């Protein structure tokens, strides 16, 4: 079966109802296994290792792309937050912009890119300023503090 959905930064697949959905190709730049300080297992086990800024796929391959990158810039390399969510590079603006462009490149015309962001350290307005050529159609805030934003981009 050909995968129709690409998750560019799957991490431990936290928000999926089916963590092994046959329609989704789960990619991440890392594979990682650990037990967190509270005893929970952390498994970052992508189907394929891939850099979201340089995806190894042809143009217009997927119907949907999911992009949930690391959101933290100020986090200790060995902290549980870094282990679980990853860490943004220092040049995070270029990383986000390049990743969105790559996601849109592999997205089919008429497809949707879902971008999830958490504002704990960097506000969504700053993130959107870093993205050239694309803007979300709509977004929705979730969580108790309204710090997580889900945004939908469309490829026309």
Regions flagged by a language model, labelled:
Residues 1-156:
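Class I S-adenosyl-L-methionine-dependent methyltransferase catalytic core
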